[in-house]
Amino acid sequence: MQNYDHLGQVFKNLRTNRHISLKQISNERVSAAQISRFERGESDISLEKFLIALSNMHIEVSEFMDAVNNYQRTEQICFMSALIPLEYERNIAGFQKMQAEEAWEFSEHPDIYRHHLNVILLQSFICKCDATVPFPEEYIDEVTDYLFTTEEWNMYELILIGNLYLFIDIPLLHRMGQEILKRKDYYWEIGSHKNLVTITLLNIWETCLHRDALTVALFYMEKIEPLLNDETDLYKRTIYLFLSGLLHYKQGEKQSGIEEMKNAIQIFEWVGSENLANNYKKDFERFVR
């Protein structure tokens, strides 16, 4: 069994939550000492002994695997939550500390590729804080290989694309965007995934505009519009208004494009989103001549 320290922790959580002692689940075929070492991640345990211990707790394998998956999701949510204040503070040292921790985890557990992907994800935050720091090309290759050999793209895969899009060339990024659109019916069943899909597609659209890939940008404008049918979703609809204005401006419809961009900035000001208003003012000044 791989990742036995991780599985051992889940096993221990299930046992202690049920107030079951090691003695109660041990017998002549699996000792309390063996189970204890497995729980602490100090040694592996054979599949036969593991199934005996699980059966002695009256837990089905499917129930255990549900707990494992939930543990992994919780672990990743904690990781992502730690990034938010660091990004707000532009705390490069904090990102580097987390990156070193993830690199160590991967060196200890090379079969848990998520730790290496977290190293790459953290590098993207460092590069966004300091534009002089290069983003290694091999990281893009590794992420691309990972994504296109992963059958289902869930929240983590969307987060990867949504944070690495600045470093991916347009043809490859467009390919990723098209894959997301193919799967959107699946994502639409889960509210958090639906929101992340829309934000990721808006990011792809924005970087296409910034890099003057107008044909691809028009593709995303047309695909994103029907996704924004909720009138209460002011944030994403306002970003859409600004980006559509920028596209129209770059296509030569300068006056209507300027009006759309100014209207979007004004909406952010009206609702008190000063940081967003200022960010889009900078974009406006950057592109409007």
Q: Which sequence ranges carry the predicted segments?
A:
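A short, Lys/Arg-rich alpha-helix, primarily the initiator
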Residues: 1-17
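"A position-specific structural signal for the A-helix of alpha-solenoid helical repeats
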Residues: 10, 49, 81, 115-126, ...
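Short alpha-helical DNA-recognition segment
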Residues: 19-37
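DNA major-groove recognition helix of helix-turn-helix/homeodomain DNA-binding modules
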Residues: 48-63
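Short, charged recognition helix plus adjacent turn
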Residues: 66-93, 266, 270
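Helix-turn-helix repeat elements of alpha-solenoid scaffolds
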Residues: 87-101, 132-141, 170-182, 211-222, ...
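Amphipathic alpha-helical segments of tetratricopeptide repeats
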Residues: 99-107, 141-148, 181-188, 221-229, ...
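Alpha-helical adaptor scaffolds
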Residues: 157-234
